[in-house]
């Protein structure tokens, strides 16, 4: 089974990816893991990627696409299939993936799209607060401290609502054309992500069982 998993930051994509891998025994291919493995193994694309990272530069698409192709060419993929997580991030990468899969003779069988209302994600992602003295982490809504005094806590820049909203807006703008691209191919399975983790996986499991 050859799959993509998509969803906005905070939608629970990582949790569900781990459950899919455990239940269906597919190879979990995440962008971070791919880059690390390619650099450690000093593959052609890994060496190239490291040269950009060492200079503090963004890795160009052609290198990222090359690393994906290297990984999808490995023998375990033929045996287990894959779950691609964190790629493609842009419509250009989606087109590159189409080309790579065609060249390797691999058919993409499904795209799991975990849908959560962006407002819910904003609340979920921007609620983290940290105690100034102890460094303990809490959440304003889901795990509030017992004796909350605003002056005793701070937020990391990444967790501030305006930063989170910008990140979500970028992800929505990049993700919508990708979803539309795969929806036109009849590959997208929308999953309601605003429910219990186990219920989300139950819905995914039903979809994937029908794909087998």
UniProtKB/Swiss-Prot annotation:
Cytoplasm in keyword set: yes
InterPro entries for this protein: Adenyl_kin_sub (IPR006259), Adenylat/UMP-CMP_kin (IPR000850), Adenylat_kinase_CS (IPR033690), P-loop_NTPase (IPR027417)
Residues noted as binding ATP in the record, renumbered to the chain: 10-15, 128, 137-138, 195
Subcellular locations according to the entry: Cytoplasm
Stated family: Belongs to the adenylate kinase family.
Quaternary assembly: Monomer.
GO biological process: AMP salvage
Stretches for region LID: 127-159
Comment text on domains: Consists of three domains, a large central CORE domain and two small peripheral domains, NMPbind and LID, which undergo movements during catalysis. The LID domain closes over the site of phosphoryl transfer upon ATP binding. Assembling and dissambling the active center during each catalytic cycle provides an effective means to prevent ATP hydrolysis.
GO function term, MF aspect, one: adenylate kinase activity
Domain of life: Bacteria
Keyword ATP-binding: yes
Protein name (Swiss-Prot/TrEMBL): Adenylate kinase
Reaction equation(s) it catalyzes: AMP + ATP = 2 ADP
Chain residues that bind AMP: 31, 36, 57-59, 86-89, 93, 156, 167
Record region (NMP): 30-59
Main localization of the protein described in the UniProt heading: cytoplasm
Function comment: Catalyzes the reversible transfer of the terminal phosphate group between ATP and AMP. Plays an important role in cellular energy homeostasis and in adenine nucleotide metabolism.
UniProt organism field: Streptococcus pneumoniae (strain 70585)
EC identifiers of the protein: 2.7.4.3
